């Protein structure tokens, strides 16, 4: 079964366990997802089945839109509600100051990712080391925060939305907001992914893969059997000859090619659609 669609993961379940449920529902063994959501988070998860599991890196998955609720003063190494150690009682802030702290995130942002993350250190996941009590530090990363919005402020909870680049840690954004308000600790009490690029939840409606790819369509004017059997393609037979990734339409299937230095290579061949 080849299928590409957007599912909605509920809070309280890991992405892999949720995928197992999807596999059972659709009676398939081969399926995957793009963009892991933490167990406490909910929201959209792109699901691919069959040969469509190969398409994830070619999908238009950015920017991503999140809605989060920050608990000011809540201390947790996971930066969510999983390991709350203590809660500082704080005086209420002026809403204008809260908005200013949120808007200050916009632009290019350098920050440390959470120690409870999937980042690897010498082949080990950071969250495994953190749970084992190993002390370590992570290199700072850069994210682009395109736009932020204050949704509501009901002290000590701040709900905000953020449009961000791929790989952004929203838990870290929450802590940064707290710090810029002069608060040492802050953890997310809720997190929802509203969309990944153009992908939003629509009751598992199958996606048109030709409209989901993050690249231009090219046109091949040579023998169609070359695409059918995965034979070498000549650059002169392509309508667009400049370097880049392209998809080619063969009616019942597509191929994804990479043009570089006047050579044409297959990235994916014969994906049925």
From Swiss-Prot:
The gene is truB. One of its GO terms (molecular function) is RNA binding. The keyword Endoplasmic reticulum does not apply. It catalyses: uridine(55) in tRNA = pseudouridine(55) in tRNA. The keyword tRNA processing applies. Its EC number is 5.4.99.25. Belongs to the pseudouridine synthase TruB family. Type 1 subfamily. HAMAP family: TruB_bact. The active site is at 38 (nucleophile). The lineage of its organism: Bacteria, Pseudomonadati, Campylobacterota, Epsilonproteobacteria, Campylobacterales. Responsible for synthesis of pseudouridine from uracil-55 in the psi GC loop of transfer RNAs. This is tRNA pseudouridine synthase B. Pfam families: TruB_N.
């Amino acid at each position: 079964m080849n299928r590409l669609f957007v599912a909605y993961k509920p809070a309280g379940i890991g992405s892999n366990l949720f995928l197992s449920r999807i596999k059972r529902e659709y009676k398939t063994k081969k399926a995957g997802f793009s963009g892991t959501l933490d167990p406490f988070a909910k929201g959209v998860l792109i699901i691919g089945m069959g040969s469509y599991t190969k398409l994830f890196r070619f999908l238009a998955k950015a920017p991503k839109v999140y809605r989060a609720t920050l608990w000011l003063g809540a201390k947790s190494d996971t930066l969510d509600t999983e390991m709350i150690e203590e809660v500082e009682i704080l005086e209420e802030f002026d809403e204008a100051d809260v908005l200013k702290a949120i808007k200050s995130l916009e632009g290019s942002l350098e920050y440390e990712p959470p120690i409870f993350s999937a980042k690897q250190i010498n082949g080990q996941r950071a969250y495994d080391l953190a749970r084992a009590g190993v002390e370590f530090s992570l290199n700072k990363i850069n994210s682009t925060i395109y736009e932020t919005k204050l949704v509501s402020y009901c002290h000590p909870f701040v709900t905000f939305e953020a449009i961000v680049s791929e790989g952004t840690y929203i838990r870290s954004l929450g802590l940064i907001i707290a710090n810029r308000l002069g608060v040492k600790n802050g953890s997310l009490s809720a997190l929802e992914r509203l969309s990944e690029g153009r992908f939003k939840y629509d009751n598992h409606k199958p996606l048109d893969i030709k409209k989901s790819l993050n690249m231009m369509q090219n046109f091949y004017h040579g023998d169609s059997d070359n695409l059918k059997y995965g034979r070498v393609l000549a650059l002169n037979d392509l309508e667009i000859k400049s370097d880049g990734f392209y998809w080619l339409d063969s009616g019942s299937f597509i191929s994804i090619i990479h043009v570089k230095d006047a050579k044409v290579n297959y990235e994916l061949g014969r994906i049925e659609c």
